[in-house]
Amino acid sequence: MLNTYITNILGIKLTEQQNGQFDAYYNLLVAYNKHTNLTRITSRDDADIKHFLDSVLISKLVDLNKVVTLCDMGAGAGFPSIPLLIVFPNIQVTIVESQIKRVQFLQELKQALGLEFNIVHDRAENFSSKNYQQFDIVTARALGELRLILEFGVPMLKVGGHFIAPKGSKFEEELTSAAHAIKVLNVELITQDLFELPLESGFRANLLFRKEKHVSGYPRPFPIIKKKPL
């Protein structure tokens, strides 16, 4: 099913190896989820659509066929970066995850899939403050509201780099709330890719921002961000 979706929607035909990696990913996710809460989505059909396909949809926004550096903040069980890496093995992925149980899962996943990616056990804002202008792409699927993740992630982007924010049906409200952050952090909204997932599985709005200029002083310490978000 996943192969059909990706072929029909993105024009990409998965290889036998890639199909095997998605199978192994699903099997490890379900097995690990029995003792560690990683996801509420456990059926294969739902995982194919809501985890794997949903993650790979990001490739509609940027060219991942060339070598690019990508940072995934708060990836949890590896979404969206690991499905992207399976399909586009040339990208250089760094995952920043604060919860040790999820880090341990990602380490097992790395070995099971035979993929190369970096796993950093840290909070996104801490990692960001030490890695200014290091990445071509930064993304975060379920880490927080838009104005927060922009402050976490934009400082890590190279000028001209892209921040991708996968959002749901309330994306317009989040954009409104993030208007000040967008201005302060010097990013521009380039694209809103709106998509209805197959089998009435939900709505996705993938928001693409471009960094126009680097601004020092961000991200601020998390207590300040939480008390006074941009």
UniProtKB/Swiss-Prot annotation:
Keyword annotations for this protein, in alphabetical order, are:
Cytoplasm, Methyltransferase, rRNA processing, S-adenosyl-L-methionine, Transferase
What does the record give under GO molecular function?
Answer: rRNA (guanine-N7-)-methyltransferase activity
Where is it found, in Gene Ontology cellular component terms? cytosol
Main subcellular location of this protein, as a coarse class: cytoplasm
Instruction: Give the subcellular location.
Output: Cytoplasm
Query: According to the UniProt entry, what is the EC number of this protein?
Result: 2.1.1.-
Q: Report any Pfam family annotated for this entry.
A: GidB
- Which spans are transmembrane here? none
Note the InterPro entries from the entry: rRNA_ssu_MeTfrase_G (IPR003682), SAM-dependent_MTases_sf (IPR029063)
Source domain of life: Bacteria
User: Keyword Repeat, does the record have it?
Assistant: no
Question: Cross-referenced Gene3D superfamilies, in alphabetical order?
Answer: Vaccinia Virus protein VP39
* The keyword Cytoplasm is annotated on this UniProt entry: yes
List positions binding S-adenosyl-L-methionine.
G74, F79, A124, E125, R141
Q: Which family does it belong to?
A: Belongs to the methyltransferase superfamily. RNA methyltransferase RsmG family.
Q: Report the NCBIfam families cross-referenced here.
A: rsmG_gidB
Role description: Specifically methylates the N7 position of a guanine in 16S rRNA.
PANTHER family xrefs: S-ADENOSYL-L-METHIONINE-DEPENDENT METHYLTRANSFERASES SUPERFAMILY PROTEIN
Query: Can you name this protein?
Result: Ribosomal RNA small subunit methyltransferase G
What is the native source organism of this protein? Answer: Acholeplasma laidlawii (strain PG-8A)
